[in-house]
């Protein structure tokens, strides 16, 4: 009888967004339970060892986090498998570095360097709005935050700007046509564009049409859309490439151009 939660994760079954090589052993670190889903998170050990190269082994990562040097969303995290996810702010005070976890257009997690000013807040997608005991309204966000007494105009699928020091809502962005958004799932993962229209399909998935700054249009499901700014001005800085997916031919031309300049 298998009782209790799974404790292992095979490397071949690990999410592609972690960019682990197939031949690096049998197992991958299994993220602990936390605010993000297993397949939508990046454990601290992979962040520090495989991406930032601050450690060579898992034991070294453990020594770093146990010194309470790593903060996620302003809170010290000492678990090497802590699941940091989309939009989380990772702070390493000893080196004075701040990162925001975002996706690149190839659907991989990227640690995007940000300024200390930008590290004070994060954007959260509203997953549900409810009324709790004694009639207290509250909303739940994509990173499992519960925020009480929100502005009554905030609805599901909107985005709230949360101050990490207080956990309070500073501002919110409505889910509207004309606002800039990032795609957080599916085939178009990591692309950034402006919402052009929304098709309602009761009983199925609503489809949202998005147009990027190059004029390419694509469609995705409503629950993959994360609004990141009003009109075309995002509230966060974007990683290199600005969320514009190039076609295979465009990528090839760019590579050849870079090669010819060397």
From Swiss-Prot:
Q: Which GO terms describe its cellular component?
A: cytosolic small ribosomal subunit
List this protein's GO terms for biological process: translation
* GO molecular function terms noted in the UniProt entry: RNA binding; rRNA binding; structural constituent of ribosome
Which keywords annotate this record?
Ribonucleoprotein, Ribosomal protein, RNA-binding, rRNA-binding
Q: Tell me the superkingdom of the source.
A: Eukaryota
Pfam families on file: 40S_S4_C (PF16121), KOW (PF00467), Ribosomal_S4e (PF00900), RS4NT (PF08071), S4 (PF01479)
- Any idea where the S4 RNA-binding domain is? 42-105
Transmembrane ranges?
none
Similarity section: Belongs to the eukaryotic ribosomal protein eS4 family.
This protein is called Small ribosomal subunit protein eS4
Q: Which organism is it from?
A: Ixodes scapularis
The gene for this chain is: RpS4
